[in-house]
Amino acid sequence: MAEALFKEIDVNGDGAVSYEEVKAFVSKKRAIKNEQLLQLIFKSIDADGNGEIDQNEFAKFYGSIQGQDLSDDKIGLKVLYKLMDVDGDGKLTKEEVTSFFKKHGIEKVAEQVMKADANGDGYITLEEFLEFSL
């Protein structure tokens, strides 16, 4: 399934997916309308930072979108949340949020995101993140 989706996105068939190919795909699917969010997700998937997503990088990412409705208005935020949730426990810690945004050179965003912790328990659930981000 991941391989078939990769091939669908890789329009020129060169074995790597460029940002433009991803942008065209999500536009066709009417998913992730915010370009800054799409760029952040792309950079997060592109682990080696070469400006393209190879099949291995895509396979690692595929789990975060598997079973998701790509036309869901919140799909970009849900994917971003899963990319930040490094340990996969379904809640974000301050360390996960800070590490993610620091890696992308926008650590000030981490402070804002931590405000999503509505109940003050030190973790951000997906629900809190979506509510805060809307």
Swiss-Prot record:
Assembly and interaction partners: Homotrimer (via EF-hands 1 and 2); oligomerization is required for its function. Interacts with G-actin in a Ca(2+)-dependent manner. Interacts with F-actin in a Ca(2+)-dependent manner.
Signal peptide (UniProt feature, chain positions): none
Record GO cellular component, one term: cytoplasm
Keyword presence, Repeat: yes
Task of the protein: Calcium-binding protein which probably acts as a calcium sensor and modulator, contributing to cellular Ca(2+)-mediated signaling. Activates endogenous kinase(s) in a Ca(2+)-dependent manner. Plays a role in regulating actin cytoskeleton dynamics. Regulates the association of actin filaments in a bundle but not actin polymerization and/or nucleation processes. Required for host cell phagocytosis and macropinocytosis.
Domain notes: The N-terminal domain (EF-hands 1 and 2) is required for localization to the phagocytic cup, G-actin binding and activation of kinases. The C-terminal domain (EF-hands 3 and 4) is required for G-actin binding but is dispensable for localization to the phagocytic cup and activation of kinases.
Residues bound to Ca(2+) 2: D46, D48, N50, E52, E57
Traits of the deletion mutant: RNAi-mediated knockdown causes a severe reduction in fluid-phase endocytosis and phagocytosis. Also, recruitment of actin to phagocytic cups is impaired.
Main location: cytoplasm
Subcellular location: Cytoplasm; Cell projection, Phagocytic cup; Cell projection, Pseudopodium
Binding-site residues, Ca(2+) 3: D85, D87, D89, K91, E96
Binding site for Ca(2+) 1: D10, N12, D14, A16, E21
UniProt-listed GO biological process terms: phagocytosis; positive regulation of macropinocytosis; positive regulation of phagocytosis; regulation of actin filament bundle assembly; regulation of protein kinase activity
Electron transport recorded as keyword: no
Top-level lineage group: Eukaryota
Species of origin: Entamoeba histolytica (strain ATCC 30459 / HM-1:IMSS / ABRM)
Coiled-coil region: none
Listed result of changing Y81F: Predominantly localizes to the cell membrane. Binds F-actin in a Ca(2+)-independent manner. No defect in G-actin binding. No defect in Ca(2+) binding
Keyword annotations of the record: Actin-binding, Calcium, Cell projection, Cytoplasm, Endocytosis, Metal-binding, Phagocytosis, Repeat
Name of the protein in question: Calcium-binding protein 1
Gene3D superfamilies noted in UniProt: EF-hand
Entries under Pfam families matching the protein: EF-hand_7
GO molecular function, one term: actin monomer binding
Residues that hold Ca(2+) 4 according to the record: D117, N119, D121, Y123, E128
Sequence ranges assigned to domain EF-hand in this UniProt record: 1-32, 33-68, 72-107, 108-134
